Amino acid sequence: MSFNTRRMLNMTKREAVIVGVADLPLKDGKVLAPMSVLQAQALVARDALKDAGIPMSEVDGLLTAGLWGVPGPGQLPTVTLSEYLGITPRFVDGTNIGGSAFEAHVAHAATAIEAGRCEVALITYGSLQKSEMSRNLAGRPAVLTMQYETPWGMPTPVGGYAMAAKRHMHEYGTTSEQLAEIAVATRKWAALNPAATMLSLIHI
């Protein structure tokens, strides 16, 4: 399932409106051809944008959730879907509250648009539970991180953070000392809580 919302300006404030909707064609409640949740979300994203008359290149907000396969510590649906669609959104939301996640995302997207955090928000949700009822639960398709990152020594989010930091250093000339300031400031604020796990301050 997918929605597309886009802001509309009036004389008083920014208002978000739903301008495109799409759903995956089903037969007897099942998809017509075998596919992954990622493929399903990409298809409805394409159709919702077509319904709205908006090119994929204009999407700068992405909100997504769903049953993506075997969960893993590096599972980042918003990043995975963004890369698959070839977009670079400036606002993302991967809040997953189950089958009604897309309903909450409509409210989140409207708030983001009205606050100026994005112009075009794409909302997707995907689950192939009924279509895959014959499969063993443990045999569900793995998310991409399990195939392309975990085998190479990145089983936890820490590796992903390190790659993001390295890229920031490459793009902007950021130094390790500058990034360390984030840890110093975070610890300082956390230590204000007497129940914090780490109370000792750190220094560069």
Each predicted region: which residue ranges?
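Condensing-enzyme catalytic core mediating Claisen C-C bond formation in acyl metabolism
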Residues: F3-L38, D47, E181-I182
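Glycine/charged-rich beta-loop-alpha catalytic/anionic-binding loops adjacent to active sites
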Residues: L26, L85-T95, A142-P151
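Conserved beta-ketoacyl condensing-enzyme motif
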Residues: M35-A107, A112-A138
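Active-site-proximal alpha-helical scaffold in enzymes
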Residues: N96-S127, V158-N193
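Glycine-/small-residue-rich "gating" segment that lines the acyl/pantetheine channel
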Residues: S134-H168
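Conserved small/polar residues in nucleotide/adenosyl-binding loops
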Residues: H203-I204
